UniProtKB/Swiss-Prot annotation:
Pfam families according to UniProt: DEP (PF00610), PH (PF00169)
Name of the protein in its database record: Pleckstrin-2
Chief location category: membrane
Keyword Iron in record: no
SMART domains assigned to the protein according to its UniProt record, in alphabetical order: DEP (SM00049), PH (SM00233)
Gene: PLEK2
Amino acid sequence: MEDGVLKEGFLVKRGHIVHNWKARWFILRQNTLVYYKLEGGRRVTPPKGRILLDGCTITCPCLEYENRPLLIKLKTQTSTEYFLEACSREERDAWAFEITGAIHAGQPGKVQQLHSLRNSFKLPPHISLHRIVDKMHDSNTGIRSSPNMEQGSTYKKTFLGSSLVDWLISNSFTASRLEAVTLASMLMEENFLRPVGVRSMGAIRSGDLAEQFLDDSTALYTFAESYKKKISPKEEISLSTVELSGTVVKQGYLAKQGHKRKNWKVRRFVLRKDPAFLHYYDPSKEENRPVGGFSLRGSLVSALEDNGVPTGVKGNVQGNLFKVITKDDTHYYIQASSKAERAEWIEAIKKLT
């Protein structure tokens, strides 16, 4: 990483004039967040834009876009709004932490205050659990329930543990994720919520009160009164649901060479096990459906040379490249943002081939 760089990587940014979404390479420094367009695996200079962080306000989680739950919102002193989407909750929170630190760099006490997690949480006297549940049911601003898959079974009208934590913070019921977990646990204890599926039920059985509600994107919950028996996987099944039913092992933004036009585009890659699949999504699209993917059984993965353009790669694309050859001899050329990231992806994929 260059001197003075606090964090860098891909984020998906909403356009100012036309509200489309495009992947950009962001570099965070002490007082600015700069973003670049990428062409042929390289960032195009000069930068596409620069966000001055002095006087900025940050909203995270930001739930203004229903189909984009991993957003950070920045509002500058001139009231310009930026919406930035990360590839995972962990990555979103890491960006938010660093950006918040950069905004308040001159006030160390403020940074400490912003990131301190309180060990105890008491519900404010003017807010009742009934009121929170009523707001959760609101058709416009409430928590969104939908069918979710876990280990091959579909559960109707459920939501993710991490989504409820985001919602509680966004609606100002709590100030931190730790407080939100405590509040969600209270909702379960009072029988407003019920765990659904192996992951969340397992946490209940563990007996550890501190970890009964999981701030996790694989743990499912539902309103107690809407609990339904799980649908048999035989009733609702297709090839894609089988492929997507595995446990997420790793996810992130990577550049990929197209099969027909050979152009390079940033995609959000999701690696799953049991069954082992690597899917990729178009981050500019609203729907959360993969645009491609393949089984890793019998696949080969290897790093490509960093000196010069490797065979099979179109254009002047060099550095941090790796290749996956599937069982049916389809070649996928992928570029990571650093050697370390490439090594992590290769190691994770190799374990599943």
